[in-house]
Amino acid sequence: IHAVRTAKKAGFQVVGIYDEASKDDQEEIQREADCYCRDWRELMKKKTALTIAGSDSSGGAGIQADIKTMQANGVYAMSAITALTAQNTTGVTGIMEVSPEFLENQLDAVITDIRPDAVKIGMVSSEKLIKTISKKLKEYHAENIVVDPVMVATSGSRLISENAIETLKTQLLPMASVITPNIPEAEVLAEMEIRLEKDMVEAAKKINEMYHCAVLCKGGHSLNDANDLLYQN
């Protein structure tokens, strides 16, 4: 009985404990309950982050890269997948988008259980998905939102429609605490050409003035170097 109460206080279903312990061994049940409680307490000490993005089958970008980065920095990572992609280091060969309803289900499931301390948004390829994300983040009063306005894969494959870009500008970017465009994305958002470092500064300044948030302009697509630029007031 004590083990059952301990497990319930920790938020675990009792059946999970019985599955891993001998039904007649109360001491073993207690140890299992204590183990669950200890793991839960350790989890609660960590910061939590939710990544909303596409799945990269090669593991080099998207949900997979976000989760690796979060875990490497001691953050408990959660995810809501916007699309499945078939891709590798040479290009994208297929994209299967989830429905807005299923994305909404994922967001509800995560946020109502383990509230994220931060949210990172990556590839969202359609207007409907962008609107779904915007609606749910407002509903749950999400904070510390990082928007990576993914438009083109590193390999050059286009990942978002023109209409979706406009919706991204009006629905998600105004909610951001930080926007992290690469050079081509910064050119689209700032509506200017970037060739030199001073152009990066000017583009970041324009984006900052439009959306009133920090801008991390990533220089990986630059012809000269891969320096990143952080612009904030």
Question: Model-found features: residue ranges?
Answer:
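Surface-exposed amphipathic alpha-helices with a cationic face
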Residues: 4-9, 67, 71, 137-138, ...
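Glycine/serine-rich anion-binding loops at beta->alpha junctions
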Residues: 52-71
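Conserved N-terminal subdomain of the carbohydrate kinase-like
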Residues: 45-51, 71-147, 151-154
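A short helix->loop->beta-strand "cap" motif at the edges of active sites that frequently abuts
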Residues: 12, 140-145, 211-213
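A short acidic, helix-capping loop that chelates divalent metal ions and anchors anionic groups
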Residues: 23-27, 85-93, 153-158, 186-190
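Conserved phosphate/ATP/ADP-binding segment of small-molecule kinases
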Residues: 162-232
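Asp-based, Mg2+/Mn2+-dependent phosphohydrolase catalytic module
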Residues: 1-44
